[in-house]
């Protein structure tokens, strides 16, 4: 499973990177943002604004802190480290890439929410895919089954977050794809590390 996640992440990131260099993809990026800006609805605007708030770094860090405190109370320290590395690592990589690539955002005329930093990759998409992957791993292992509901809700979360950033006019589609890819790749690599750790420690110490 971590290898599948790693492959999907590489595909997403690869498509996102192509958007930086292929003129036809850049034109499609801008056309998508322009088209969505002409078909906005009030209730979708409200949902987009809400997702922009709950999907940002402050809320993600706060939520991760609460989960880690809960796990630390039950002495599940490996899981605390796993989640902490997942969140901190994805945040760091996302913002480092923003600084290095420094891709301009879509024109401000299309924005309906505030935005910070460069466009590539979408930080909200990085956070959303990271949390979705962590949730799928933790919940599936907690119940010892691959619950389709867990997977569905997790997928809906990161997909809706990514689409909302395009709808809001603050990111191009390839920014979102790259953000998803970064989250998937980072968590897949950490998952492989966790599986190696699992061979030395009991399952009870690692998962919820």
Model-derived regions: residue spans:
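Core segments of transmembrane alpha-helices
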Residues: 59-65, 128-132
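Alpha-helical transmembrane spans of integral membrane proteins, capturing the lipid-embedded, hydrophobic core
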Residues: 7-11, 83, 87-91, 180, ...
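Membrane-embedded catalytic cores of phosphoryl/pyrophosphoryl-handling enzymes
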Residues: 4-5, 111-208
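Aromatic-anchored segments of alpha-helical transmembrane domains
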Residues: 13-17, 88-93, 156-166
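Short helix-capping/hinge motifs at transmembrane helix termini and TM-loop junctions
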Residues: 21-24, 74-75, 101-102, 168-172
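N-terminal transmembrane-helix/juxtamembrane module of multi-pass inner/ER membrane proteins
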Residues: 1-59, 99-112
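Alpha-helical transmembrane segments of multi-pass membrane proteins, especially transporters
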Residues: 34, 82-87, 153, 176-180
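Membrane-interface loops
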Residues: 31, 73-141, 145
């Amino acid at each position: 499973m971590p290898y599948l996640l790693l492959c999907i992440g590489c595909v997403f990131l690869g498509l996102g990177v192509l958007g930086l260099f292929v003129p036809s993809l850049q034109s499609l990026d801008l056309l998508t943002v322009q088209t969505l800006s002409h078909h906005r609805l009030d209730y979708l605007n409200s949902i987009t604004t809400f997702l922009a708030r709950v999907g940002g770094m402050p809320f993600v860090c706060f939520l991760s802190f609460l989960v880690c405190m809960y796990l630390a109370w039950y002495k599940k320290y490996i899981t605390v480290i796993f989640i902490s590395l997942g969140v901190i690592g994805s945040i760091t990589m996302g913002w480092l890439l923003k600084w290095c690539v420094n891709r301009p955002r879509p024109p401000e005329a299309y924005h309906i929410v505030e935005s910070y930093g460069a466009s590539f990759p979408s930080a909200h998409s990085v956070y959303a895919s990271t949390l979705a992957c962590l949730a799928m791993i933790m919940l599936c292992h907690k119940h010892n089954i691959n619950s389709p509901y867990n997977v569905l809700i997790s997928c809906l979360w990161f997909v809706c977050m990514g689409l909302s950033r395009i709808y809001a006019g603050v990111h191009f589609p390839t920014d979102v794809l790259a953000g998803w890819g970064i989250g998937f790749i980072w968590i897949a690599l950490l998952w492989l590390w966790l599986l190696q750790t699992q061979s030395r420690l009991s399952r009870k110490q690692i998962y919820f």
